[in-house]
Amino acid sequence: MLGIETTCDETAAAVVARDSDGKGRILSNVVRSQTDEHALYGGVVPEIAARAHVDMLDHLIDAAMREAGIDYADLNGVAAAAGPGLIGGVIVGLTTAKAIALVHDTPLIAVNHLEAHALTPRLTDAIDFPYCLFLASGGHTQIVAVAGVGDYVRLGTTVDDAMGEAFDKVAKMLGLPYPGGPQVEEAAQRGDAARFAFPRPMLGRSDANFSLSGLKTAVRNEIGRIAHVSAQDIADLCASFQAAVLESTADRLRVGLDLFKQRFGAPTALVAAGGVAANQAIRAALDDVAQQAGTRLIMPPPALCTDNGAMIAWAGLERLALGMIDGMDAAPRARWLLDANASVPGKFANTRAGF
C-alpha cells in the first residue's frame, strides 16, 4: 500500500506491506518537513504549505517507491489522507492518489488522518481491540475508545486549544523558535517547575474533556509581570507550564480510562499517538497513568507519532482488508470527525478544536 500524507506541514509518502499473519512491514517512509518554509512566520501558513506539497509530493512518492523496491503494478492500493486538515494540502494529496489509482487501476482508500493515528499502534505492536487512545497533536486532543477499524467512540476532547497548539503558542510568547513544542520541552528540562503556580485545568471533573486556553493565558500574564525575561525565566516558565499540562493530562486520562471501562471493560492498552506524544515528559506521565490503571502503555516510535505516510498506508491496509474502498468521488475535507456520533461538549461555547 502506498500512503500519502499532506494534511498540514509535512509532505510524506510511504509503502507498507501486510503479511499473511496480519503484521505490518514498513518498506519505505519518506517525510519532508516544511519547518524552514514556515519558521519566518512563527506558524503554518496554509497557502505556503499547499504550494510546498505541490512542489515536493511527486518527488517523495518516487523516492518511497524506489526505496521500497517495487513498481506501481505491485501495489494493492493507494491511500491518501482525505482530511481533516488544511484543505489546500488535502486536495493535493488526495488528487495525486486518485490519479495513481486511475492510471494503475488500483483501489483508492481515502483515509481519515485521525484514524491513521488511531491505528498506527497496530502497525508497530500486536494489539487487539478495544484499546484506549490518547491523541494529542497541534490540531487535536482527544481520548478515544478504539473498538475496531471504523468504530470509534470519543470519550473526551479539548473544548478550546489543542495541546500541541498550546505548546506552540507558549513558545511564541517566549520568543522560542518554531516549531515551539520541542523548544518548550527542551527549556523545561533546565527550569524549576515549582516557581510558577499555574492552574491545573479541568482537574477533578467527571467528564474527560481538556481545556488549555486558561493555562495559556496564565502563562502570558506571568510573562507580563517580569520586567526583563531572562533565559532562566524562560526555562522556569516552560517547566511550570509543562508540569501543569502533565498533571491535568494525567487526571483527564484517569477519568477517560474509567469511562472506557464502564462501557467496554478493561482496555487492552492505553495508546498514545500524535506529535505531542513524542514529548518525553508526557510519555513518562502516561506510563504512570497506565501502571495505575493496571494496563500497558503502547507508544509508537516518535517518527510514527508525528505525521507520516506509513500511518496512512497502514490505515489503508486495515480498511482494504475489510473491503472499505473509496470511489473517485471521495471528497477532501477540512473537518472530519473520527467519531461520527460525537457531539459538542455541553456548557462550552468554544469548541473549534476537534469539531
From Swiss-Prot:
Cofactors: Fe(2+)
InterPro entries for this protein: ATPase_NBD (IPR043129), Gcp-like_dom (IPR000905), KAE1/TsaD (IPR017861), Peptidase_M22_CS (IPR017860), TsaD (IPR022450)
SUPFAM superfamilies found in the cross-reference section: Actin-like ATPase domain
Matches recorded under Pfam families: TsaD (PF00814)
Location in the cell: Cytoplasm
Sequence positions that bind Fe cation: H113, H117, D307
Top-level taxon in the UniProt lineage: Bacteria
PROSITE patterns, A to Z: GLYCOPROTEASE
EC number(s) from the headed UniProt entry: 2.3.1.234
Cofactor-binding details, from the entry: Binds 1 Fe(2+) ion per subunit.
Keyword Acyltransferase: yes
Signal peptide range: none
Family statement: Belongs to the KAE1 / TsaD family.
Entry protein name: tRNA N6-adenosine threonylcarbamoyltransferase
Job of this protein: Required for the formation of a threonylcarbamoyl group on adenosine at position 37 (t(6)A37) in tRNAs that read codons beginning with adenine. Is involved in the transfer of the threonylcarbamoyl moiety of threonylcarbamoyl-AMP (TC-AMP) to the N6 group of A37, together with TsaE and TsaB. TsaD likely plays a direct catalytic role in this reaction.
GO CC, one annotated term: cytoplasm
Binding residue positions for substrate: L135, A136, S137, G138, G139, D168, G181, N279
Catalysis: reaction(s): L-threonylcarbamoyladenylate + adenosine(37) in tRNA = N(6)-L-threonylcarbamoyladenosine(37) in tRNA + AMP + H(+)
Main location: cytoplasm
GO term, biological process aspect, one: tRNA threonylcarbamoyladenosine modification
GO molecular function annotations of the record: iron ion binding; N(6)-L-threonylcarbamoyladenine synthase activity
Keywords, in A-Z order: Acyltransferase, Cytoplasm, Iron, Metal-binding, Transferase, tRNA processing
